[in-house]
Amino acid sequence: MDKPEHPYLENTIPSMRAAFDHGADVVDLDLKLTKDQQLAVFHDATLEYRTEAKGEIGNYTMTELKQLDIGYGYTADGGKTFPFRGKGVGLMPTLDEVLTAFPHKDLLLHVKDGNHQTYEVLWGKLRAMTPERFNQMTVYGNDDGIAWLRQQSATLRLCSKTMMKAGLLRYLAVGWTGYVPHELHNMELHIPRRYAPLLWGWPGKFVDRMAAVNTRVMLVEGDGQWSAGFDTEESVTQIPPQFGGYVWTNRIDRVQPVLARRR
């Protein structure tokens, strides 16, 4: 873990609000299913690294999870200090709470636990949304779960690594014609900066072609790490001036002023 430079814990409503206040267009959050079938927002595979509890999210009810301190285990010096201990009690939100807190914001929902039932519960919430709210949601996760969601909806923006790879390989073969394969419709694409120039029409035409089929292009730093972000002013200079899509960052507080000057 890095030494804290701000007072926010990930996957909490205060940290999401801070991101939006700094100018984020979309915020990413992680979902896991609780023992009582609620969608908790939490990243780690188990609770013991962040909290004082042990086990998985699915072993607890949401009421029990609300009692935990999600800042309990945060340490940047091997356990000498715990700067967030005592400050994260009750901060683990549900998806419903996030949706209520940000009723008009775009959200990127990452299903973390790989449990098919999690996708079913999530779909129950998505299908009850208005068309406008539905269009603000994007979901990514494992191959089987995302394929199942595609069966439920042809228009929900989705992403899995297999889906993305298949669609982009097709595009590499035919993109010179301007045609966008149906495999790339209604998606989110995480495109590594190092490989992006291989795509036909990159950057401007490619982004426009994807936008025309309801696909969001997210540029990530480096060579393919899923959430490698443009987290320094220097890294932002590597973004092509003509790029009009989305940029992944884990430090919008640092880079938003630089990104804003590019617009």
PLM feature spans:
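Phosphate-group recognition and catalysis centered on beta-loop-alpha active-site segments
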Residues: 1-263
